[in-house]
């Protein structure tokens, strides 16, 4: 069940069920001739909460999200990466380094959608509520307002209150609830707009 597609590396990256794939057309017939499983083991607790919404960041990283009932255990060259419940993923494709943030639903109970602005700042959306989040502050590890010393401990502390993942809480709201986020802008706009 495909829930995200992003062009890159001479083909397309695909969020497909419990896997992240790379598909490539090598003979020009517009069909994938090569399929590579980059990672598998993403949570499959509910079909509308699988890994989704993949996007490139300006540094080449791939960003994607997962929903509330996903309990992911992904084997990478850097070890097993665990991420429970709604969360945001970052993959550095050249190194195959996979990192998870906001486990335990710290920033919305059903993350769906990632967008990056002209300055490389990452934002994500929660499909279970009208809130959107500035992702970067919540990625800072090594302590939290609850006194936790790790992201995992912090996720347990924040389970009952996802808006507290970072002191700024939700950055914006959309009405009605949506499952996507996009940043509208262009370098061609005058600065005063």
Regions from the PLM with identified roles:
Residues 1-193:
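Beta-propeller blade termini and top-face loops
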């Amino acid at each position: 069940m495909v829930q995200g597609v992003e062009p890159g590396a001479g083909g397309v990256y695909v969020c497909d069920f419990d896997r992240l794939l790379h598909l490539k057309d090598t003979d020009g017939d517009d069909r994938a001739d090569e399929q590579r499983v980059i990672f598998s083991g993403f949570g499959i607790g509910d079909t509308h909460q699988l890994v989704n919404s993949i996007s490139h960041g300006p540094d080449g990283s791939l960003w994607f999200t997962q929903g509330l009932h996903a309990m992911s255990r992904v084997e990478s060259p850097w070890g097993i990466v665990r991420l429970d419940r709604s969360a945001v993923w970052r993959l550095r494709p050249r190194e195959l380094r996979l990192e998870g943030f906001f486990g335990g639903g710290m920033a919305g109970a059903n993350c769906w959608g990632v967008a990056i602005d002209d300055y490389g700042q990452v934002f994500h959306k929660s499909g279970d509520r009208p809130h959107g989040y500035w992702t970067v502050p919540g990625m800072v590890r090594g302590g939290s307002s609850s006194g936790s010393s790790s992201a995992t401990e912090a996720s347990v502390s924040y389970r009952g209150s996802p808006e507290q993942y970072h002191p700024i809480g939700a950055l914006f709201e959309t009405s009605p609830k949506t499952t996507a986020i996009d940043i509208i802008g262009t370098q061609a706009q005058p600065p005063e707009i």
